């Protein structure tokens, strides 16, 4: 990843460079969990949180790893924890916290109907989302894009004001985000 002198790094390179030893699949989806509230929040960061649909603490969204999304992630990194979600955690998240309009759970029948038989089960769809081959938008407008999570069982292990690299909870966590998500489901 050497670049010519004076060239700027892309947002994806910055996010993965900040976490040495934990290089991510460039196509894998990211999960973002908002950890901090709205008090003393800069207006531009609040707008970015709204665009990401992270309006409350303990809300999570799954996003593709694109240039525009990575720019937004870079802006809100001091208020969210994010990382690479695996298929098993994604399946558990969709089954337990995924909702359709009317507050009904997402099940195999809904996934099969919404994806026009492309994915027969929630597990198959979750694997496709985790690998970046599908997005949550593929479920249509009836599926809610936000997962409302609980605070983690056992509490946060570090400060919600410090980054993960300095024994906090914020910022890029790589695959270790899956442990946090499982405790929040």
Can you say where each PLM-predicted feature lies in the sequence?
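Core subunits and conserved enzymes of cellular information-processing
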Residues: 2-185
